[in-house]
Swiss-Prot record:
Source organism (scientific name): Prochlorococcus marinus (strain AS9601)
Domain of life: Bacteria
InterPro entries: AAA+_ATPase (IPR003593), ATP-dep_Clp_protease_ClpX (IPR050052), ATPase_AAA_core (IPR003959), Clp_ATPase_C (IPR019489), Clp_protease_ATP-bd_su_ClpX (IPR004487), ClpX_bact (IPR046425), P-loop_NTPase (IPR027417), Znf_CppX_C4 (IPR010603)
Official protein name in the record: ATP-dependent Clp protease ATP-binding subunit ClpX
Family: Belongs to the ClpX chaperone family.
Pfam families reported for this sequence: AAA_2, ClpB_D2-small, zf-C4_ClpX
Binding site for ATP: P146, T147, G148, S149, G150, K151, T152, L153
One biological process term in Gene Ontology: cell division
Xref: SUPFAM superfamilies: Glucocorticoid receptor-like (DNA-binding domain) (SSF57716), P-loop containing nucleoside triphosphate hydrolases (SSF52540)
Length: 455
């Protein structure tokens, strides 16, 4: 049994155990309750000082560059690219999706005009005139389309064309504040980085949030468990989409009370959200295929049957806001994205065009690769059609095209660099058919094994 030591003292103030209310022991040291209270007061004062420094705009501005010679925003109406010019640039890289390209072209054009209008109004010195001026509010955009339909490609192509900062973020990594994952403010940090940490320039930018359907709440009905990566993220994004002063940690990660934050006004930032929304077609089909309970006349039954005939691939053209609510987006979130564009599912003909027509078409890319080995590569029209047919079967959109061509070209790119006498090479339909043809052999157990036919 340990003996009681009456001479124990606080290692910081030196008071004995009899002079204090509580003495806490550590590995070879002791601290009293009075010293603990003093430490808490010091930490509280430091916290208040840091908060005062964070909320002081001049101190924040000193840490940020104000001039960016590499980028400029055209704020004169005559220098703003017209919607036809923007769509023409998109046509060079993206095949089809005419409706989505028109919506994006008009939205970007109006974004430029809002920036020009704001600069014009800010330059006026007459306060009475400013108070009566019309305020132009932004219209955020929601892109809905199946995987591989070109949502991300449209955003990346816009980024090449625009003179404003453009950032792409992934919604799948976001969580509600206080949980493991990224805060929504990290989206703004990406825009800041694209602007070389220029706050004024970042406040005129455009942000594309990909995989936005992944933050849909897990159930249409309220749950007692907290949905930190679904509805919680939607709630956190509301003010940012609408327009607010957001505090962004310059180093990324979670906001810390002892770290300075950069303040960004999101009222002039255009947000474009995109997602595949798998299962949304079924919700639309179910709504359109509803029929009444009880007795119905023949004419009523014919009306119901007519609605049921709608092709599931075209059902998203009849999309309503209630369908998005049933999918898992809260009404407040939908209300802050008033413009909705539905991308078409890619057909076989569209996939053929994607292989050959765009500026960076896959066929052109592989021709360039083999030209570096002094080999001229060509594709027969039938082979392009066969590749498109195989991609259509995989149901992953344009992404399947690269996978198929990589598999098709593997042996060719492996042997051709060593064949000095080969100067031309042609991809035929037979080569494509031999690569992907298969037959099913039944095993005694009843299972199936797929064996590729030899060429």
């Amino acid at each position: 049994m340990a003996k009681f030591d009456a001479h124990l003292k606080c290692s910081f103030c030196g008071k004995s155990q009899d002079q204090v209310r509580k003495l806490i022991a550590g590995p070879g040291v002791y601290i009293c309750d009075e010293c603990i209270d003093l430490c808490n007061e010091i930490l509280d004062e430091e916290l208040l000082d840091n908060q005062a420094n964070t909320n002081n705009p001049p101190q924040v501005k000193k840490k940020l560059p104000t001039d960016n010679p590499k980028k400029s925003v055209p704020l004169e109406l005559t220098s703003i690219p017209k919607p036809l010019e923007i769509k023409s640039f998109l046509d060079n890289q993206v095949v089809g999706q005419e409706s989505a390209k028109k919506i994006l072209s008009v939205a970007v054009y109006n974004h430029y005009k809002r920036l020009a209008w704001k600069v014009k109004e800010d330059s006026k010195n007459n306060n009475a005139t400013d108070s009566q001026a019309t305020k132009l509010q932004k219209s955020n955009i929601l892109l809905i389309g199946p995987t591989g339909s070109g949502k991300t490609l449209l955003a990346q192509t816009l980024a090449e064309f625009l003179d404003v900062p453009f950032a792409v973020a992934d919604a799948t990594t976001l969580t509600e504040a206080g949980y493991v994952g990224e805060d929504v403010e990290n989206i703004l940090l990406r825009l800041l980085q694209k602007s070389e940490m220029n706050v004024e320039l970042a406040q005129k930018g455009i942000i594309y949030i990909d995989e936005i359907d992944k933050i849909a709440r897990k159930s249409e009905n309220p749950s007692i468990t907290r949905d930190v990566s679904g509805e919680g993220v939607q709630q956190a994004l509301l003010k940012m989409l609408e327009g607010t002063i957001a505090n962004v940690p310059p180093q990324g990660g979670r906001k810390h009370p002892y770290h300075d934050c950069i303040q960004i006004d999101t009222s002039q930032i255009l947000f474009i959200c995109g997602g595949a929304f798998i299962g949304l077609e079924d919700i639309v089909q179910k709504r359109m295929g509803k029929h009444s309970i009880g007795f119905t006349t023949n004419s009523d039954q014919n009306k119901v049957d007519t609605k049921k005939i709608v092709d599931p691939r075209d059902s998203l053209k009849n999309l309503e806001l209630d369908d998005l609510v049933k999918y898992g987006l809260i009404p407040e979130f939908i209300g802050r994205i008033p413009v909705c564009a539905v991308l078409d599912r890619l057909t076989k003909e569209t996939l053929e065009s994607i292989l050959t027509q765009p500026r960076d078409a896959l066929v052109k890319q592989f021709k360039t690769l083999l030209s570096m080995d002094n080999v001229e590569l060509s594709f027969e029209p039938d082979s392009v059609e066969a590749i498109a047919n195989e991609a259509y079967k995989r149901k992953t959109g344009a992404r399947a095209l690269r996978s198929i061509i990589e598999e098709l070209m593997l042996d060719i790119m492996y042997t051709l660099p060593s064949e000095e006498n080969v100067k031309e090479f042609t991809i035929t339909k037979k080569m494509v058919d031999n690569l992907f043809s298969s037959k099913i052999v039944k095993l005694p157990s009843g299972s199936k094994r797929i064996i590729k036919e030899s060429a």
